[in-house]
């Protein structure tokens, strides 16, 4: 012992004591037991084998794209929670293996993740995972250095893995990896954890020979070593030795001593040591005390844990650390101790009453389920969580976890317990279990679940029987028999309905009629089995039986329970029946249907005129007009049919409608519908005077609510508040319960506010509240624009009163954005004291500070120090001193007060706030404030925790916008001076600036897609002397990089004739260049040459994908399929573009089988390359259409929209291709399907997509007719706005937006559409059209936004025309960002 300590003193000579001493923490889970057998350590084999001649940056760039997000997620998880999941680690590991080029950092991160960061896994499993990762990475060519060996050592210690330290050193030496100080420290820890002081002495000897310092960490491990050797006296004496060596024992030392006492169960010495630490003004963190708890639990002294828990200070981060401790304890079987720690969360959450504490037990319960803890134990913990107020519904959450983990027995036991506690147990709770049994056709498991639920009084419903139970058995009868045989209580009503559905789907109409006509059959609405019955009707030719069933449905009240009565119910059934049949089926069964309709007439079955019209349209589209007269006889005689009900009505003009009104009036017939059409036509033409005249002329006829709504909005658009108010009051007198849509109410508020009629505006707002008008996402934004328009007019009274009403009535939350006009109105007047007082009022009343930055900038510019000090005091009080300092900093920077700004940034204790810094940097970029941004970057150099790469990235973004390569070059120099390691995005941005300005890039650029790093290396070394071979290769690479594929190929052929070979990277570069130019045959020749010269040469992912794209372009689809198959067999990943191009080409050939082959290939990797879920669906449809099988295409897509878990987005692609390929017959049937989905299922996306495609290809009349048949298209605002936005991105598309607005004159987002239309005119340089649009908006009283005005002003100025308004001063980007924030209603409260 004395020799050991003497060696330590010798090494701790002056000059070495001050060196940094990374500690070896004895964290929960750190290793204790070692042996002298190498075991699995054989994986750390000598680093030998083939190493590629040079890295291929194209593959590395793709690698970064494909799984760097996951690595970032892993790193984020560690930083946030201190742990990761096995699933995440395995996913990242799989991605690394698949890519095949692991970097050093990635390997290090994966290895480090296999220790205590996986508290939910057993230690042995964690070690096995580390071994697998090590072996696989080594196999893939990863080069391990000392950091990797040290990481593996740390994992061994944390996982208590037994290994021989001397063997470990030997393996490192064999691999030519020199151990460093950290290696020796961890090897000493390995010996000390075993109590092997002699072994530790050997390692200390190594350190002495290498003149390495003995740090505090070494002494800490010696404390553990002596304690585990049974020598507590020497363990305590280590502290004296440390002091004599000039090292004061730190927290880690005391933790080591406390852990030693804990392993002995010596609670008295633990308490005494803790008191000594406090007396000496030392401090142990909660995480330190958790290590003591871990040791007490493992040593078998749980009775002392509470004493340690009571000493917790609940530091920031306590809960995540305690969670990890709990998980580790539970994994090792100490769940009761873990629960004791968990109960401390109540005290830790005391100061955070945000509801999070009610879910702190989630992780605990989930881990209990994963560890297969018995139900009674889980229940015990649930009760404890409830008592401690750590979970609002612990038993329900435990059930959710057990269902998610497919733990059937535990789930059923928990349901039983829930029932005993009086909690509801619903039938759908068992669906996850039944689904798994359904897949396995496991009748026994299904019966077990049903029986268990039956025993606790839970009866299954029809959905459960139909979807998850009956399909497990051979037939319904056997299902009923087996369930009854096992004593399962079956709800006869639901089971009978399930049986009815089953018989109907089977086509057994006789049994269906028998069941429905049975007096014992339960009362059930037709809607529950309509679909199944339609299927049966289509399969059967028994007209008599179908008529009997229809009559039964009509006359038996059990089946028509809706308030609308049997006319509607049976009518919709008939409509759906015809709708479900293809044209060919309707034509083939024309006579059959005629007989059916006749029998319905004889049975006195009646349908409504509205439903008749729908059936008529279906029959007409199926080309069986003769059947229409057989249906019309079913119409209720009390309803009036016009001539337009028999033939399709043509588009009517105003004069025609007026004539029809006069005719109907003369015949004393109602003409309300025609009058509505006439008014609507005048509204669409913006003819307010004529619309009001028509309304006045026929005032005796009751106008529909929709007519009043259209007139009101027309008057609002024409800034006529008097007529708008009169119409609104008249509507209220006629029908006080009438409710307008949201846009009409907003139009009224806007026009009243604009004209100073505040009381009227407030009355409208009150009505919105009283009538519970639905508030859309855009409503708050509309309120903001109304208030902001008043603020810009300087109308403070209007702003204040309307804002107060909006907030008081609860129509919108008082966000910073909504409150900003309250301040803006004073800023517009230049009244800073009033703006400040309003700001303070908003802060106190609404907890937000709107336009704070603008107010502070005005105060700084004016030099009003008193008001500025008052503002700072308020901000500091409300949001803290840190927020106040940042607000003041940005105000100084914005106004050019850089000396004052620097004083702020040098405030002691100021830390970086990335969100705030990003906000101001992006503001500088938007407003082109280069000087302010440069100063910000310079000032934040020494700001604590400031991400310097981020700051320089912002600066370079502005340099790029200004094409200022000199400032970018200066920034690059400063980056190097500060020793900042720039990220890839920063380097790419910097390289782009240099290249755009014709400057040489002074560094290797991380390449993207198929560009090769070798190319840049060749260019960088162009000045070096080279051999003829290297000169030839360099020439090929340079030409390839410049996309001069033909010249590169000629150079290659010249070298080939001279017998000169190239490197693998040069061949790859040339092949990619030729493929990108479509030189397929030449690329194949180069590929063959490369394979002959270089053994094992293959194309990488990007080049292989490019090969597929080229083969598709040349129509070599079989070759493309073979190439894709070869890629996947070689563990390569195709690009999204390659797969998409191939599938689309197969569809145009009608090759459905080929598409299905590709779909199967992509099943496991489709999500990783972000393949659209609609790619295969759309192209299968298209393949069916190309084959002439329209019905199959419709059968493929329709269930996807009508299913319960529909995730279908858009079939716009299919519509477009059908139009391009002139498939009019198919298009007509697709149109019928889209309209059917809209009318029957309220699924409007398909019909809206078709409408927009008609506009896109210029088929305006078709779009108009479709809109007339399906008016709901006009209400699909998000889809329509998206179409307008996309159109505005492409030059020459203004007409599309104009056509859309012409077709939908009442479009709710008209202001947005006008803004995009102005963008089109600006792109097309069409100043005349832009001016006309501006005048049109003024005539409609539509206020243009600032981005609109900015675009118009620039356009007019460039055209040499005068600008008739004050041009907004900021940049386009500034106003675009502002609009985005307004739209999302997410304006940052601090700004």
UniProtKB/Swiss-Prot annotation:
Residues 1-42 form a transit peptide. One of its GO terms (cellular component) is mitochondrion. It comes from Xenopus tropicalis (Western clawed frog). This is Leucine-rich PPR motif-containing protein, mitochondrial. PPR repeats lie at residues 110-144, 145-179, 180-214, 215-249, 250-284, 389-425, 704-738, 741-775, 779-813, 815-850, 948-982, 1028-1062, 1063-1093, 1100-1134, 1310-1344. May play a role in RNA metabolism in both nuclei and mitochondria. May bind mature mRNA in the nucleus outer membrane. In mitochondria binds to poly(A) mRNA. May be involved in transcription regulation. Binds single-stranded DNA. Residues 1118-1387 are annotated as: RNA-binding. The lineage of its organism: Eukaryota, Metazoa, Chordata, Craniata, Vertebrata. SUPFAM superfamilies: ARM repeat. One of its GO terms (molecular function) is DNA binding. InterPro entries: ARM-type_fold, LRP130, Pentatricopeptide_rpt, PROP1-like_PPR_dom, TPR-like_helical_dom_sf. It comes from the Eukaryota. Keywords: DNA-binding, Mitochondrion, Nucleus, Repeat, RNA-binding, Transcription, Transcription regulation, Transit peptide, Transport. The keyword ATP-binding does not apply. It is found in: Mitochondrion; Nucleus.
